[in-house]
Amino acid sequence: MIIGYFLNTKDYYNLFIWKKRVLLLKIISQNTTNYGIQVPSDTILRINLAWCSSVKQLKDILEDHKNNSIFLDLPIKRIKPPNNKYTLDDLIPIISSSNQIKYFAISNVESPDDLEDYIEKIPTNIVLVPKIESPTAILNISEIVNVIPTDKKILMLDHDDLFAKILKNGEPVDNFKIYIQKLVDYCDSNKVILLRTIGVMFSDEEKRISD
């Protein structure tokens, strides 16, 4: 299986050669740039639109990182703050005109129907990345992957939200590992890239990209 990692730390190059697995994606969070950490040109910059307060601000970020490929992450049905205040339709002109944007993640995907609008509107050269955040999504994983229109298939796992959904559903805590293993096995068998978060950056001062 090919696994990509989201990294929030500066010292990450030594993490990419692990056993016999070759990692194709090096993705770093936009929030690291608020602390003067430089994003290497061969690294993909992930822009979580929950932390981007306007379309203009997104344009500014793209302008500041012309040499990087971009991974946009659009929160859908997000309850916890912060949250974006614009729609997919607001983003389409930017997405369609930018050669930097290579990936577009959609949160809370639980069925193929959740991707329908994005498949219709997002340019076909951009890889759609369903975010897997619930047991329902994992149970429907084959159907979800089958509708991704690009040859490259990528999924993004949110461990915290998956665990929260398991607790909310009243399921045994042990199911957490079972669901993750089911997802990993599926990706392994079907040559699907699975993005998982490793590394956290801590600071005594919060600097949000929307400040």
Region roles according to the model:
Residues 2-211:
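Expand to "…catalyze enediolate/carbanion chemistry for C-C bond making/breaking, isomerization
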